[in-house]
């Protein structure tokens, strides 16, 4: 897969070495008509005031507004366009808001505390998941009595099917927010936990994945946390570093299978496609790597499913429930690419994330499905330098810096791309387009950091209009619960969707092919060429919203 991405990027780098200006854009009538068309659409926009049968939330981990914009440019350039004018799938969603991402104890949050906010409706502390702010990081005994419930849990309680699909490990902080209660977000398996919290009764995240609630679809990475220590990995049987890690000797996959009729476990793309299309399958677990799934450019399309594949498979299985479903999908490797200071990895992941959103939009009706796209936090990622229209998103600014050397449009505020030699290194256009290139950073840190900026929320479907203005991040969970008439909003007073009894007929499964093709859309325009150097959420929710029932 990496070769295909490289060829595409080389192609548009050569094509876009000169800035191009569409001649029609020089005419004011072009922009007047464009605005008039958008205005006509806006005037006809009517909120869908029914309840939502289905609930989908797409989480772009670390996908701040700058990342969204850069992804839009990359997508457009991969399609042969100039870039910024090309819409993303999420751009077509009619409602938008901003989300305040701070956690209770941190101005700049992490993926754990934010997941608790947008999935459980309660803000909490740094590195804790599924617990209130009364719990303390790394203090096991503060977990009990401070657990909070997710919207997914409430959807399951209401009779819906539920699922998670992720491009990281399924025990990662973001998907874990749908099912776990932990004061330490990296307790992936029991081997990752100290002795004391185990003695005090705290459970690792993998154990809670199969025991806290009844999840119909689980797709992502994280195999090694599910099997006894030393168990050979099916994909890498001779690699001792990829064997199972569980010290309690449990086979959690087998335990999960034994609980459910109609359940299947898969570990590669072909099996995923086959089982998801089997109408007898109502429970599907797919774990495709020992830890995190591969970056999109490194993915083997014959062995490893894309996030779009996982989304489509999940929707096939979940849609078999006439009462509807709840689905969480995360583009988790966007975040990892940014932490590495490697924008190429982050943005190519974001392009695939957007394709998963597009696939879900084709499979799920806007009339009965509330779909939300958002991010947990942003990153110290930016792009600038007055680059000319059509310049590769990975390219150089048109003018050199004060030291006489070129610099990339994309830069990081901190990260591993800092070079402390006393002299900023030169960077060439070829280097800046290398998939492994780490953009220069102002401050040296081992892993680039998140930021405290607001992030965008995109929404469509029933009650999507409630996502407006600037909101606290936990408001997202309350909108989803209200739209689905789930606790604590079971008396929502909303009529059912008009087509609630319509059988779900997903589009033809696009993952049945074993080769990957890229469709290129070319927009023909007349151009001129320029030379280029290269909080309205409830103040207090009912008690049932906040606390997990003791067992």
Swiss-Prot record:
Alkaline phosphatase that can hydrolyze various phosphate compounds. Ca(2+) binds at residues 235, 288-289, 304. Keywords: Calcium, Cell membrane, Disulfide bond, Glycoprotein, GPI-anchor, Hydrolase, Lipoprotein, Magnesium, Membrane, Metal-binding, Signal, Zinc. GO terms for cellular component: plasma membrane; side of membrane. It is a lipid-anchor; GPI-anchor. InterPro entries: Alkaline_phosphatase, Alkaline_phosphatase_AS, Alkaline_phosphatase_core_sf. Binds 1 Mg(2+) ion. The active site is at 111 (phosphoserine intermediate). This is Intestinal-type alkaline phosphatase 2. Homodimer. The keyword Metal-binding applies. Residues 528-537 have a biased composition (Polar residues). Coiled coil: none annotated. It holds the Pfam family Alk_phosphatase. Residues 532-551 form a propeptide. In most mammals there are four different isozymes: placental (ALPP), germ cell (ALPG), intestinal (ALPI) and tissue non-specific (liver/bone/kidney) (ALPL/TNAP). Rat has two genes for the intestinal isozyme. Zn(2+) 2 binds at residues 335, 339. One of its GO terms (molecular function) is metal ion binding. The lineage of its organism: Eukaryota, Metazoa, Chordata, Craniata, Vertebrata. Mg(2+) binds at residues 61, 174, 330. It comes from the Eukaryota. Belongs to the alkaline phosphatase family. Disulfide bonds join 140-202, 485-492. Its EC number is 3.1.3.1. Zn(2+) 1 binds at residues 61, 111, 376-377.
